[in-house]
């Protein structure tokens, strides 16, 4: 059953790949958004040289390219073939040599243990049938002292609905919603507790208020429907 659910999830994102970057929040369009993302990455990235990094659930490569621009070697993985194809197209177009993209299941990575200094994901956990197994898998491929970073949100917060076109708002997900344990998101505090339960140390989090404010302002400027999702980043380290 899990494989069938994953195929439905992959098919959904596969169809969205050609226009994924046009959807709200999937790109940086304003100086305030740029400043927010710079602060976020300054906050969560380990302060040591070039890192071997994995972007789990990379989509079309937003975080992959952000990390590469900071001098890191990055592999992006995604279960949706069209997302990987679009990420590779962008990589070739931009001439970015320090990135690679592979079609892979974030719950069952094709890498040996202790392969990376950093594993990062954005808005992925809530789409997975086995999110806790994914966290274990991400920890498995991290080196001692390596860091896990999750950027996510609580998409049912208050009266807010999920982003248009997302898995949460799509009728095709009605049949599998009960098999996605984190559908709708989890709170920052819940993810911090989850990190600790899985053995990570020096766990911390940030509510991303600057990013939320920047995106809210952009909604006003573009005449979009107002949404007030809670967003956050949580990070923790593998013990040495």
Residue ranges, per PLM feature:
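A conserved beta-strand element that flanks and buttresses the S-adenosyl-L-methionine
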Residues: 120
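Conserved class I S-adenosyl-L-methionine
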Residues: 1-49, 62-66, 174, 209-211, ...
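Short catalytic micro-motifs in class I SAM-dependent methyltransferases
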Residues: 123-124
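Nucleotide donor/acceptor-binding cores
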Residues: 50-52, 114
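Class I SAM-dependent methyltransferase SAM/SAH-binding core
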Residues: 52-56, 60-108
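C-terminal alpha-helical "lid/dimerization" subdomain adjacent to the S-adenosyl-L-methionine
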Residues: 7-8, 24, 151-217
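Core SAM-dependent methyltransferase catalytic element
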Residues: 217-240
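A short glycine-rich, Lys/Arg-flanked "PGG" loop and its adjoining helix->strand segment in the class I
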Residues: 132-144
